Amino acid sequence: RQRQMCIRDSIWTTEPIVDYLTQFSGIQPDDLDPKRTQRTLVSHKTAYKKLRMLTDLGCRFIGHGLAKDFRIINIFVPPSQVIDTVQLYHSPAHPRNLSLRFLSWFLLKKDIQQGLALGVEQHDGHDSIEDALAALQLFRKYEQFERDGRLEDMLEDLYEIGPRVNWRPPEKIAS
């Protein structure tokens, strides 16, 4: 029942990549170059097999917006094995899904995905490891709110503060 990150692989391809979508993926061209990267590169098939094995073993996956990730790799993970912070922090009274960045700022007091806020395409602008750790911390925070009987109050606070800050962490003032 250990809740920790266990896969840190990047998928390489032999096909030419037209756009790395760095502002969303955090990936730079060197990251997927086997001669230059410090990342563990695996094929799509290997990544799929790892996920399939973990799914078959009954592992639970914790993340933010996992449905899209699973759809991209073309794998079905039973809903009972998915803990998605998009769903955990969704209020039936509000149609909006909350971003990982906003949830991390509001609940964890961490400003993640800083390159996204600045519109900067830099390696540390978005980091899948940082996102995975934030989702894990948000899940633990959710469990804490649930244990303490404060879940409903916290959700009300989230949806009250969100519109005031346009659902984003306030901009930091340069010193």
Stretches found by the model and what they are:
Residues 28-40:
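Short histidine-centered catalytic/ligand-binding loop motif
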Residues 8, 12-25, 29-31, 49-175:
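Metal-dependent phosphoesterase core characteristic of DEDDh/y 3'-5' exonuclease domains
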Residues 37-52:
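A short, well-structured juxtamembrane/interface segment
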Residues 2-7:
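Short, small-residue-biased leader/transition segments that mark boundaries at the very start
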